[in-house]
Amino acid sequence: MTPAEALAYLHQLSQFGFQPGLDSTRRLAAAVGNPQERLRFIHVAGTNGKGSTCAFLESMYRAAGFRTGLYTSPHLVRFGERIQVGRQPLPEETLALLVSELRQRMPADLTPTFFEFTTVVALMAFAEAAVDVVLWETGLGGRLDATNIVTPLASVITSIGLDHMQVLGGTVGEIAAEKAGIIKPGVPILTSVDRADALAVIQYRARELDSHCVVVDAAAVSRMTWPVSLLGPHQRVNATLAVVTVRLLRAFFPVSDEHLTQGLAHTLWAGRMQVFQRGEQTWLLDGAHNADGVAAFRRALTDHFPDRHPVMVLGMLRDKAWREMATHLAPATSRLVVAPVSSPRTVQPEELREALQEARCGRAVRACASVEEALRAVTREPFVAVTGSLYFIGEVLERLGEIDPSGLVDSSAAGDDQRRLNEWTPATPR
């Protein structure tokens, strides 16, 4: 199987969408010898911040000399971003070998989803690489997420907000219950959740399972004074949660304070308050895609660029609270340029422009038919911010040909078929 054939096979699995439940993933893992049983995990869930928290954890452990595995989603440009060993994306040739092996061993009656199959490929890759610790991000929710077949050394819940409500529930409490599904008997749970109703759900579940619950609150964040590479007050919360987790697990992975500070100072996470220069232009890219994420982006923008109002390039998905997010972002801009996301779920630019005008946002809005047109429209602007969707961020990075500092973005390796693998759709009955 070639790399192109492996990606085509994975793309074909995306037709099965999201199928809640763990049976398929368990059967897939069993077919290749349950590689998860040879690995040690930190399992991270949350509405926002889980990827950043995983990135902080990975950076600190790598600074201390541990061999790390990092599993996150979605990818921005290249599939290998999802599965990393020592912060290096999975090579396409390795992906092809693992996909081929799993496909051959898969039970004939099984029709796994893209994410279920990818999750087991990640387990195979990490076991083969003999990593010391796996930073293991959930895909959607927690309780029924494919990643939940593991028993970790610690479970981590970053934040709880309203997102994916069509699957996880319509209230913060219901969503918290789904995220709390990653808590395992006797395994410590660490959380920076600050909503009282959500925190109560997590603490109740921890008591039920005799799991020690550590709450990282505002006081703990204020005591964490080490420099953090990622911008925004929300990233200081994520960094503090990661530090507390590393300290709790020092019996398994000794990490000195020197390595903690090195890791925090050198954490890279593309598309999350990512700043770079292109000639005279400053670019700021952030994948905020729900109300809480947009609020955090606004705060970070004000804190770090208090006297600057960027031209904002927006691309949004229809199954998000896009009207609310767009109108909340508008006051922070000098003007807006809106474009479609390469997804059937995109909000059309004219519809987004009309919604902003109806909301009397007080800013000029230009609707563009493509990402390329939107980027041409801002070529002379000194400060450009791009937000609204992680998928949109990936498209912009690809079009700009920008290699992000972590070396993860390789525009030559990207393509429409790879990007469509980011898509989430409800499962068809099977």
Where are these regions (language model features)?
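Nucleotide phosphate-binding/pyrophosphate-handling subdomain across enzymes
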Residues: 38, 133-138, 145-156, 160-161, ...
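C-terminal helical cap/extension that packs against the catalytic core
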Residues: 192-214, 218, 282-283, 291, ...
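A conserved segment at the C-terminal end of the G1
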Residues: 44, 52-69
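Conserved catalytic-core segment of NTP-binding enzymes
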Residues: 140-146, 151-210, 322
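Short, flexible loop segments at boundaries between secondary-structure elements
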Residues: 341-345, 407-430
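ATP-dependent carboxylate-amine ligase catalytic core
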Residues: 16-18, 22-38, 63-150, 166-168, ...
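Charged, amphipathic alpha-helical linker segments immediately N-terminal to NTP-binding catalytic cores
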Residues: 1-16
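A glycine-rich beta-strand to alpha-helix segment
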Residues: 373-401
